[in-house]
Amino acid sequence: MSYSSFKYRDFFGGNTVMVIVPHQDDEINIAGATIYGAIEEGLDVILVYVTNGDYQYKADIRYKEVIKMAKIMHLPLKNIHFLGFPDGYGKEFLSNRESIVTHHAGFSQTHGACNIQDYASKYMGRSLDYTYTNIVLALEDIILRFKPNAIIAVDHDIHVDHKLTSIAVEEAIGIILKKQVTYKPKVLKSFAYDTNFESINDYYDNHLESTVQNRQWIKDKRWSTNNPMLLWADRIRIPVPQACRNTVLIENPIFKALGSHMSQSSYKHGPKLINGDQVFWERRTDNVALHATITATSGDCSKLNDFLRYDVRDVTKNIASSIEYAWIPDTKDNKPTITISFNKPTTIERIDWFENVWFESDELNGLQGVTIKTSNGLEVNVPQYSYPLFEDCPYMKTYVFEHPIVVEWIAMTVTKAKEGIAGISEIEIYSFNESKPTFCHIVANQQFAYDWTIYRRESLPSIYVYYDSMLDKTDMEFSIDGNSIKRDFMMDYIPVMIQHGPVTIRYGNDSIYHEMMMKKGNIIDAISKKCLNLYNKFMYILCKAKYRIGFNLAQKYRYKGF
């Protein structure tokens, strides 16, 4: 049996988590197991839908499906909020951010359904026109109203409404962080498609697999993720609750919750979402540049500290125009310089900056180097990097000072190739990383391990430990059946021990720990696994009939021609 010190309350830094998604079913796609586990632990989960999911279907059916999902996930209806904007209009919202959008059914203001009011009508005293600006306004209002300890939101997926939601959430958070110096929620982003809804179907493998990417759903194959400013290697992995690891497919709450969204036939994607971990990317909110004054020798520098690393206006383009999201110095500026001024002496330790997206074939559009100068006389030259590996990501740069320094200002002078459109989209400056590790988890063959059976013809898995933050490991140790052991010896010892029965492997100390059971499988284990897979496939076929009926019933809510 697997045991862990992991607590959602510790990981999120409090009791309240807000999940913000564009459509009804995306809550399961990006955070299903996390929502279930957090509620099970007693946390308040607040769910926010940006759109009514009403492009093909009337909002009524999508609301009814949410009510069914909430029962499965034990999510109180009072914690669910519908912003009430239209589905499918991300392109229109982003391309002209002040204009009012009109839904094909004639709606042009936020509204609810099924006797449920939209958020603005209920809390802000009026419905809102369908504009991008009002989406940001509503998001800002709901975040400040509840002030969650953590915010989980969708990131730049291939769907236009996902891009819209990601950009609007980040803009709202940027506005809030600039106004509220003390409120710094933990912000986590995730993808709904390549890692979840359209991920790899590995449910029937011998072991519970961790989240993987389906690279076919990455819009540019040279990118690490669908957001060029996020690296796959930088993802945060967290364990999933036992119920969401249920090996009986139709009893797993993730499968059942997806099944409640019958108009979308979401149940079909259930096996892809049931994994041994859930992955997120953290956007730190302790960036001191957000509260600094930034000036530039040329160009519009307002984008440099708005919390948005990658903005898009024309979603029909695979790569956004640099002018849409980055500071671009004038071509005649021979010494383009940004100056970040603080209102008081500030301790800094690290600078991250994010350049406009470019590739090897487009090298003239990349910065050639940066010179950093500080008010205390320090000068550092950061050359253009050479990137032999895809994962190295040439448009994300970091400089870490040898020791924390106290400064009043920082100046960054950039060199760029002539005629190139090179610039910086965001600057993030950090005093020091206050985050502390909240958990560790044993990993076998790169998979989050819970209980592990070594089946016939399988080798002993490679074992290491995952941490959610830098960890002082001086008092952390492995043990087998209660006896301390070094990792190198352990890998030689386990094959001998499992010949005599299951062993319990533990890593950690008294406060942070994880333990799992490992055993050598026999013919009965192999047959049992095959029988379980056959049972799951058979029950899945039976369930399809029920879900088809639900899908057919939902068609009466479908707009004609859609």
Residue positions per predicted region:
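Short, compositionally biased P/S/T/A/G/V-rich stretches that sit at domain boundaries
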Residues: 435-457, 529-531
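Active-site beta-strand->loop->alpha-helix modules in alpha/beta enzyme cores, enriched
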Residues: 1-182
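Aromatic, loop-rich ligand-recognition surfaces of beta-strand-rich domains
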Residues: 319-379, 393-438
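Membrane-proximal basic amphipathic "stem/tether" segments
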Residues: 1, 524-562
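Edge beta-strands of extracellular beta-sandwich domains
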Residues: 511-523
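C-terminal accessory domains and tails appended to enzymatic cores
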Residues: 2-4, 11, 92-99, 105, ...
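Surface-exposed, short loops/turns at beta-strand junctions within beta-sandwich domains
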Residues: 403-406, 495-500
